[in-house]
Design a protein with these regions (language model features):
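One-carbon transfer enzymes
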Residues: 1-112
Length: 112
């Protein structure tokens, strides 16, 4: 049974999990990642590895600066109706209301 999954992640470490969920046939209803950051000598805006891969997979991407304070983004994500959230190295603390939203809960993959 394919699940509707909301994926949260930022660095390259999180990309294989996103790809595996996508390959398994689950419906990724959204990908939440950190906003583009300025890096390098030219201070160019560089997207996260997860954002880059999500766009290649034609998945909807959300980049809240601070999810705890962005109530509009929280509502948009709730409206996606995900069955499950999968979090892998997102980089922000998720508010309780976000954690409680999916009926099947949230799964956190941690590298430590």
């Amino acid at each position: 049974m394919a699940l509707k999954i909301l994926f949260w992640g930022t660095p390259i470490y999180a990309v294989p999990t996103l790809e595996a969920l996508h390959r398994a046939g689950h419906r990724i209803v959204g990908v939440v990642t950190q906003p583009d950051r300025r890096r390098g000598r030219g201070r160019q805006l560089i997207p996260s590895a997860v954002k880059t891969r999500a766009l290649e997979l034609a998945l909807p991407v959300f980049t809240p600066e601070k999810i705890r304070q962005d109530h509009s983004c929280q509502q948009q994500l709730a409206d996606l109706g995900a069955d499950l959230s999968v979090v892998v190295a997102f980089g922000q603390i998720l508010p309780v209301q976000v954690l409680r939203q999916p009926p099947l809960g949230c799964w956190n993959g941690h590298g430590s």
